[in-house]
């Protein structure tokens, strides 16, 4: 079994750019950014429970990494960058810490490196279970209306919230809930030490209005790019800023 993905081919000899979306997104999420890099072959992946991979279920990050690796093999991708937002960034960091063959580097936008104590994990598990129950039982428009009121999304205006609620409500609530629980921050290990000891290039993107993840970025041994005029979802709020940072990263 492999994950559903959309492949766009560029010039031979360059590494692939493998894009991983955030929770409740899909393979279209990164395409505005990715299509600015037409020289590179691009793979836009649907993570389990989402888009064309909605029927694929996993028990945890190990399953996601295994599926991602099998997907890369199926496309004969031998050299690649992982580019991930939020959940996709966490998947990218988890996979990269497994020393993937052919990995050139990782670019994470607003991805959490992991909670650092049992109390934080227990609180996050309670919260994610409550959200999962709502995704399973309530209309998605109502759930996402509340989801986008969370503090991390304070930079969004009312029109942006309404647009995201309408877009994300096309998902399957049951499969979203399953993925939320399987890849909860509560079950993700703290990756700070692994990332510090890494052998791959590591870059971190965060919006200038995303104070939480700017603080987290400062804890990581990564080159940080602050995206102007953007909050947590920087590639949506300022795609040109993210394109500029990614172009700078890929020039090295």
Swiss-Prot record:
Pfam family, one: Abhydrolase_6
TM stretches of this protein: none
UniProt keyword list: Lyase, Menaquinone biosynthesis
Gene3D superfamilies: alpha/beta hydrolase
GO process terms (BP): menaquinone biosynthetic process
Organism superkingdom: Bacteria
UniProt-listed Enzyme Commission number(s): 4.2.99.20
GO molecular function annotation: 2-succinyl-6-hydroxy-2,4-cyclohexadiene-1-carboxylate synthase activity
Catalytic reaction(s) noted: 5-enolpyruvoyl-6-hydroxy-2-succinyl-cyclohex-3-ene-1-carboxylate = (1R,6R)-6-hydroxy-2-succinyl-cyclohexa-2,4-diene-1-carboxylate + pyruvate
Major enzyme class: lyase
Pathway the protein contributes to: Quinol/quinone metabolism; 1,4-dihydroxy-2-naphthoate biosynthesis; 1,4-dihydroxy-2-naphthoate from chorismate: step 3/7; Quinol/quinone metabolism; menaquinone biosynthesis
Subunit-level organization: Monomer.
Function: Catalyzes a proton abstraction reaction that results in 2,5-elimination of pyruvate from 2-succinyl-5-enolpyruvyl-6-hydroxy-3-cyclohexene-1-carboxylate (SEPHCHC) and the formation of 2-succinyl-6-hydroxy-2,4-cyclohexadiene-1-carboxylate (SHCHC).
Family: Belongs to the AB hydrolase superfamily. MenH family.
Name of the protein: 2-succinyl-6-hydroxy-2,4-cyclohexadiene-1-carboxylate synthase
Gene that this sequence comes from: menH
């Amino acid at each position: 079994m492999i994950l559903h993905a959309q492949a766009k081919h560029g010039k031979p000899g360059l590494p692939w750019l493998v894009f991983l979306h955030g929770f409740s997104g899909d393979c279209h999420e990164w395409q505005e950014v990715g299509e600015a890099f037409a020289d590179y072959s691009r793979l836009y992946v649907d993570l389990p429970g989402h888009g064309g991979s909605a029927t694929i279920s996993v028990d945890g990050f190990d399953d996601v990494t295994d599926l991602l690796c099998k997907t890369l093999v199926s496309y004969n991708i031998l050299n690649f960058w992982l580019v991930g937002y939020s959940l996709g960034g966490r998947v990218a960091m988890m996979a990269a810490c497994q020393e993937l063959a052919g990995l050139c580097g990782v670019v994470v936008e607003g991805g959490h490196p992991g909670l650092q104590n049992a109390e934080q994990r227990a609180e996050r598990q309670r919260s994610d279970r409550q959200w999962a129950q709502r995704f399973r039982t309530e209309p998605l428009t109502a759930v996402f209306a509340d989801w986008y009121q969370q503090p991390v999304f304070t930079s969004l205006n009312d029109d942006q919230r309404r647009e995201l609620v309408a877009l994300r409500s096309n998902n399957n609530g049951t499969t979203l809930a399953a993925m939320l629980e399987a890849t909860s921050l509560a079950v993700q290990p703290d990756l700070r030490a692994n990332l510090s000891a890494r052998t791959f290039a590591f870059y971190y993107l965060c919006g200038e209005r995303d104070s939480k993840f700017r603080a987290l970025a400062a804890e990581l041994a990564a080159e940080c790019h602050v995206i102007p005029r953007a909050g947590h979802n920087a590639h949506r709020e300022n795609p040109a800023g993210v394109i500029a940072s990614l172009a700078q990263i890929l020039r090295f």
